[in-house]
């Protein structure tokens, strides 16, 4: 789990997301509180529940991007889901409990990777030994048994050195590797996912779990495959499962996007029961319940839930009161200005302008964005957002793609040339489209 301070988390988010300081502070505090809770005495720890967050703001202002970046920073089981993918129990579609099952799968995979990383050095040594046994078969005595002392012979050590230096990488050998398990795909009816998971496991066991097959491959590929195989042997699956369930229960973070789409708007008179039903199904998860997964029972009492929505067709007060009460921290994200667009184009790591410069550099075309050119792009995107539908920073992608379309198409024929994207160039490519509202609606 991440031990970063709130200030460090915000600083890291600043390098990818422009503005939205309130939202960044809220998620940073929530993430740090996960660490603080684990430092408490066990009796008090069980009483401290996470303060779930509701992020409100128009589309394209950074809600989803905050979730993506948080997932990388958290170093904890994290899952992002769309609320619209789920339906009420009894309707065709996914049930909300599958969120916890998927999160547990993420935790199992994450814990397994961490455990394998810890034994990587030993696993590599074992893999090297297996390859050296193929390259230099051990000498046998009269009874066919391996003679001792061969492992430390000078020739073997010389080959081990060459192997580590990569001098044998392209040599082909025949090696015994674990045969891939034959997957049995079973379509699960709603609510029966657990049973189908068990059936799949049963069929895989029947097909033989630990069969090996001989494969011819280069030593570099064999070393990778055998290291993974040896690493899996050195970890205890039961311990991993226990650790993963502990992690998911105490550090798990669930990000639910588009929560406003399951609100029944105040002007809505349709009989859309399943929308409100999804909210009611979410209640026990957010409040704390026990969910059955193929890895065991998982409690959701101390998981952190972060929800977000644009709330253009509905209001936060349209959520059912019980769910509103379980999302105590409200954060409003602000709409982006032309200045924000200008910063988005230049400040974040791997900004849009950086990406286009790097992409065209692969064709030996040098692209340079001037200060006034970037300002004009930002103003154009902001103007189109104001006159048509406001889609936030996503408009920049559309505008930039339109702006760079010609040079991207001709780049392969302009080897060694340069392009300066200034205000005049931007106006010549976008001026007419931005000025004509009807064209903007269809093209930008």
UniProtKB/Swiss-Prot annotation:
It holds the Pfam family AAA. It is found in: Cytoplasm. Residues 147-157 have a biased composition (Polar residues). Residues 141-161 are annotated as: Disordered. One of its GO terms (cellular component) is HslUV protease complex. One of its GO terms (molecular function) is ATP binding. Keywords: ATP-binding, Chaperone, Cytoplasm, Nucleotide-binding. Gene3D superfamilies: 1.10.8.60, DNA helicase RuvA subunit, C-terminal domain, P-loop containing nucleotide triphosphate hydrolases. It comes from the Bacteria. SMART domains: AAA, ClpB_D2-small. ATP binds at residues 18, 60-65, 257, 322, 394. InterPro entries: AAA+_ATPase, ATP-dep_Clp_protease_ClpX, ATPase_AAA_core, Clp_ATPase_C, HslU, P-loop_NTPase. One of its GO terms (biological process) is protein unfolding. The keyword Repeat does not apply. Coiled coil: none annotated. The keyword Transcription does not apply. ATPase subunit of a proteasome-like degradation complex; this subunit has chaperone activity. The binding of ATP and its subsequent hydrolysis by HslU are essential for unfolding of protein substrates subsequently hydrolyzed by HslV. HslU recognizes the N-terminal part of its protein substrates and unfolds these before they are guided to HslV for hydrolysis. A double ring-shaped homohexamer of HslV is capped on each side by a ring-shaped HslU homohexamer. The assembly of the HslU/HslV complex is dependent on binding of ATP. NCBIfam families: hslU, PRK05201.1. Belongs to the ClpX chaperone family. HslU subfamily. This is ATP-dependent protease ATPase subunit HslU.
């Amino acid at each position: 789990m991440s031990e970063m301070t709130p200030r460090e988390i915000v600083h890291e988010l600043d390098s990818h997301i422009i503005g939205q300081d309130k939202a960044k502070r809220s998620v940073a505090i929530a993430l740090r509180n996960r660490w603080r809770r684990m430092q408490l005495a066990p009796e008090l720890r069980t009483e401290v529940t996470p303060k779930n967050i509701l992020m409100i703001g128009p589309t394209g202002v950074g809600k989803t991007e905050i979730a993506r970046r948080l997932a990388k920073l958290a170093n904890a089981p994290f899952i992002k889901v769309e609320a619209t993918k789920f339906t009420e129990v009894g309707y065709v579609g996914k049930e909300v409990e599958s969120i916890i099952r998927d999160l547990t799968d993420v935790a199992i995979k994450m814990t397994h990777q961490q455990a394998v990383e810890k034994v990587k050095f030993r696993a590599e040594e074992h893999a090297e030994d297996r390859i050296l046994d193929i390259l230099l078969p051990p000498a046998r005595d009269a009874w066919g048994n391996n003679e001792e002392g061969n492992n430390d012979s000078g020739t073997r050590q010389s080959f081990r050195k060459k192997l580590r230096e990569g001098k044998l990488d392209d040599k082909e050998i025949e090696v015994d590797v674990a045969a891939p398990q034959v997957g049995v795909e079973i379509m699960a009816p709603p609510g029966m996912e657990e049973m189908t998971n068990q059936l799949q496991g049963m069929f895989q066991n029947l097909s033989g779990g630990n069969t090996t097959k001989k494969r011819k491959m280069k030593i570099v590929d064999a070393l990778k495959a055998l290291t993974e195989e040896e690493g899996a042997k050195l970890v205890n699956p039961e311990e991993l499962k226990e650790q993963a369930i502990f992690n998911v229960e105490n550090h798990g973070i669930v990000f639910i996007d588009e929560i406003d789409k399951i609100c029944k708007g105040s002007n809505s008179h349709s009989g859309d029961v399943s929308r409100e039903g999804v909210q009611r199904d979410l209640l026990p998860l957010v409040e704390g319940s026990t969910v059955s997964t193929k890895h065991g029972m998982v409690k959701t009492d101390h998981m952190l839930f972060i929800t977000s929505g644009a709330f253009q067709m509905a209001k936060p007060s349209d959520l059912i009161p019980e769910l509103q009460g379980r999302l105590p921290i409200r954060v409003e994200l602000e709409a982006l200005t032309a200045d924000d667009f200008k910063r988005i184009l230049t400040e974040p790591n791997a900004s849009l302008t950086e990406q286009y410069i790097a992409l065209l550099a692969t064709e030996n075309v040098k692209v340079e964005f001037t200060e006034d050119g970037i300002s004009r792009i930002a103003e154009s995107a902001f103007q189109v957002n104001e006159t048509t539908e406001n889609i936030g920073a996503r408009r920049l992608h559309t505008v930039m793609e339109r702006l760079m379309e010609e040079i991207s198409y001709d780049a392969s024929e302009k080897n060694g040339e340069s392009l300066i994207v200034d205000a005049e160039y931007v106006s010549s490519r976008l001026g007419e489209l931005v000025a004509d509202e009807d064209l903007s609606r269809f093209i930008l």
